[in-house]
A protein has these predicted regions:
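Thiamine diphosphate
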Residues: 1-58, 64-87
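Active-site-proximal beta-alpha loop/turn segments in soluble metabolic enzymes
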Residues: 63-64, 157
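Conformationally flexible catalytic loops at phosphate/diphosphate-handling active centers
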Residues: 93-184
Length: 184
């Protein structure tokens, strides 16, 4: 991510919990990425691999935006929305679905092809992301310490990015709907 690569990962339950410290950093640095999560229960008094949202809900405070799906077709379509929106919004996404029924369902779906999605990528936002990448040719300092006054001001300035997310997601849902004929 810091090198300007577009990335995503796939995980569930305890694996997602191990990522929480990194999620704060990713969101705080406005690095676009998507975590695809097969939402499952967390181990408590016994081990259980059935679906609930306990793992996903434990990440709400990290700064990631969230999209949820209820069918395998929605997983296909809205994964595209998540990837497109994270680039434009600069906000990372958790894209999640039921970790038992949906993740194990065998169903015919209509695939979105790369050729369908490529024209939807905000090329300017992608170029800006890559221009901020760490590289030996353009060294920068990141992750410095701040006093409370500047830290608070910087955190408040982040709100404009989050306020833009719903409109960006809606825009891409409409564009995906135009391609697929399915309304989101």
């Amino acid at each position: 991510l810091q090198a300007g690569a577009l990335t995503s990962t796939y995980t569930a339950s305890q694996g997602l919990l191990l990522m929480i410290p990194n999620m704060y950093k990713i969101a705080g640095e406005f690095l676009p990425c998507v975590f695809h999560v097969s939402a499952r229960t967390l181990a408590s008094h016994s081990l259980c691999s059935f679906g609930d949202h306990r793992d996903v809900m434990s990440t709400r405070q990290t700064g990631f935006a969230m999209l949820a799906e209820g069918s395998v077709q929605e997983v296909m379509d809205l994964a595209g929305v998540a990837h497109l929106a994270t680039i434009k919004a600069r906000v990372p996404f958790v894209n999640f679905f039921d970790g038992f029924r949906t993740s194990h369902e065998i169903q015919k779906i209509e695939m979105l092809e790369n050729e369908d999605l490529a024209p939807l990528i905000d090329q300017q936002a992608l170029a800006e992301f890559r221009s901020r990448a760490l590289t030996p040719e353009k060294p920068v300092a990141r992750g410095m310490a701040e006093n409370p006054d500047t830290f608070f001001a910087h955190r408040e300035s982040c709100n404009t990015y989050y306020e833009a997310v719903p409109a960006i997601v809606e825009e891409y849902m409409e564009k995906i709907s135009e391609i697929t004929g399915r309304k989101y």
